[in-house]
Design a protein with these regions (language model features):
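Surface-exposed ligand/attachment interfaces on beta-rich extracellular proteins
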Residues: 20, 39-65, 75-93
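Extracellular/surface recognition and adhesion modules
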Residues: 27-31, 68-70, 91
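Extracellular jelly-roll beta-sandwich "head" domains, especially the C-terminal globular C1q domain
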Residues: 53-55, 79-90, 98-144
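Solvent-exposed loop and beta-edge segments used for protein-protein assembly and interaction
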Residues: 23, 64-66, 132
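Short, solvent-exposed coil/turn segments at beta-strand boundaries
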Residues: 62-69, 118-124
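Intrinsic-disorder/low-complexity, polar/charged segments enriched in Ser/Thr/Lys/Arg/Asp/Glu/Gln
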Residues: 67-71, 137-139
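Fibrous stalk/shaft segments of extracellular and virion attachment machinery
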Residues: 1-43
Length: 144
């Protein structure tokens, strides 16, 4: 069974590039605590080593019955364009397909040429080269 704590740790460890946990009892509190810890850990809150920066102010977790929806706002911050085939991050075992349902939605800033694939081994990769400076939102829904 997946739980909020492990989802938050995955966000912190894999996407936010920090070892984070939470003691919050509500989803709003968990996001606030996660954002607070991240901002204290790095000069660039949410910055990942692989060219992805998370905007924690636009990040949310919402629980509906047996699913948790995680909405993440990213910005590409790599100095050079990220090449096609680059793995942006890897879902941990408990959150790989088919446990991730409706895995990805994007905001309007992404054109059709900037595509991603989520593979059954849990890797989330670019299909095409992506320039720096793009902002996009992805929504993942986890079963819990």
């Amino acid at each position: 069974m997946n739980d909020l704590s492990s989802i938050l740790n995955w966000i912190g460890n894999t996407i936010g590039n920090s070892a984070l946990g939470t003691t919050a009892t509500t989803l709003k509190g968990a996001i606030a605590e996660l954002a607070d810890k991240t901002s204290k850990k790095t000069a660039n809150p949410g910055r990942s080593t692989d060219g992805i920066e998370v905007d924690w102010n636009e990040t949310s977790l919402t629980k509906y019955d047996n699913v948790v929806e995680c909405k993440l706002r990213f910005r590409t911050v790599a100095t050079n364009p990220m090449p096609a085939g680059k793995t942006l991050f890897t879902f941990p075992v408990g959150y790989r397909p088919p446990y991730v349902v409706r895995p990805i939605t994007y905001d309007w800033n992404l054109s059709s040429v900037h595509r991603f694939n989520l593979y059954t081994d849990g890797t989330f990769k670019l299909v095409d080269t992506m320039p720096s400076g793009l902002t996009f939102i992805m929504t993942f829904t986890f079963t819990v």
